[in-house]
């Protein structure tokens, strides 16, 4: 009888669905995009569609840079295995064990096949943050005290500071620099949008190029961890292997897109300045400014003649 008694959570817990920070970023971007679309009819001429493309493209780049800092699917892996459910128990269950690695920590999932087994609903998602070594070990000890399932604790143990695998040192360092460089990319994204709204297009193009380079360097920093010896996570004959996730590939595509756009704009700036003026809606404004300057010069000349 004692073998079937397991520790439970003090109250029912809801499994992870969506990260609220990601939802907030998506809502902010959608509201901002809708705002610009509403004021779109007030823009005259051929520059309307170009202006809309600029706004949506810039919002997409900024949203990706900001969102991937909080996602947990930079590197993912899932394995299906039959394993022990709880420590010091002989009860076995068939489940899918998932490992989701992000810049802020890891998420370890356990989903039963089927979900309802051993008189329980087997659907767990536990987050272990690595803001510091003490924080990760504290989360691991809390998991031990709460009686988390054995597969979750087994995977989390591989990332503890004292584990011989050394995964914590590898991932903590690489994700730290990846996150910091990605925040630099976000700052340069804000800066190039400000510069594009001013008559200093070349500086805006340069900052857009810097944004792309920062994103790519951040990806290289994260990918460097895979060059280290891999500590395999075994569940019987099954092995939990990881691969780059959606956030990594999305960041790569966005970084390359930003790089290509900046190089194209730089080429047009050097060879086709009229096209650049059209893209950034500077042509009409410069004509008006030239016209106003001529009118002021003409009026000042007339007043000078009257005085003479």
Swiss-Prot record:
Ranges annotated as spanning the membrane: 22-42, 50-70, 173-195, 200-220, 248-268
Pfam families: DuoxA
Keywords: Glycoprotein, Membrane, Protein transport, Transmembrane, Transmembrane helix, Transport
GO annotation, cellular component aspect: endoplasmic reticulum membrane
Ranges per topology, Cytoplasmic: 43-49, 196-199, 269-308
Ranges in coiled-coil conformation: none
BP term (GO), one: protein transport
InterPro entries (UniProt xref): Dual_oxidase_maturation_fac
Entry's family note: Belongs to the DUOXA family.
PANTHER family in UniProt: DUAL OXIDASE 2, DUAL OXIDASE MATURATION FACTOR 1
Free-text function comment from the UniProt entry: Possible role in maturation and transport from the endoplasmic reticulum to the plasma membrane of functional dual oxidase.
Protein name per its UniProtKB record: Dual oxidase maturation factor 1
Organism: Xenopus tropicalis
């Amino acid at each position: 009888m004692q073998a079937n008694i397991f520790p439970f959570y003090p109250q029912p817990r809801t499994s992870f669905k969506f990260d609220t920070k990601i939802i907030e970023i998506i809502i902010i971007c959608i509201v901002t995009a809708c705002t610009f679309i509403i004021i779109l009819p007030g823009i005259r001429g051929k520059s309307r569609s170009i202006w809309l493309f600029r706004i949506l493209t810039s919002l997409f780049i900024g949203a990706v840079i900001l969102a991937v800092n909080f996602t947990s699917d930079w590197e993912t892996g899932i394995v299906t295995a039959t394993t022990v459910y709880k420590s010091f128990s002989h009860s076995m269950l068939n489940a899918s064990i998932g490992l989701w690695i992000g810049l802020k920590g890891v998420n370890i999932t356990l989903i039963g096949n089927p979900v309802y087994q051993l008189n329980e609903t087997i659907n767990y998602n536990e987050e272990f943050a690595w803001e510091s070594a003490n924080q990760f070990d504290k989360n691991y000890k809390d998991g031990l005290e709460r009686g988390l399932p054995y597969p979750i604790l087994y995977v989390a143990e591989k990332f503890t500071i004292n584990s011989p695998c050394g995964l914590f040192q590898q991932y903590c360092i690489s994700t730290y620099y990846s996150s910091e460089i990605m925040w630099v990319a976000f700052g340069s994204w804000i800066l190039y949008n400000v510069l594009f709204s001013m008559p200093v297009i070349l500086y805006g193009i340069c900052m857009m190029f810097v944004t792309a380079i920062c994103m790519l360097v951040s990806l290289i920093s994260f990918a460097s961890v895979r060059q280290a010896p891999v500590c395999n996570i075994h569940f019987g004959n099954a092995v939990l292997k990881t691969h780059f996730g959606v956030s990594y590939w999305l960041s790569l595509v966005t970084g390359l897109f930003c790089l290509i756009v900046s190089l194209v704009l730089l080429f047009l700036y050097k060879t086709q300045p009229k096209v650049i003026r059209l893209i950034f809606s500077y042509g009409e404004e410069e004509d008006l400014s030239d016209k106003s300057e001529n009118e002021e010069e003409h009026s000042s000349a007339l007043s000078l003649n009257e005085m003479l």
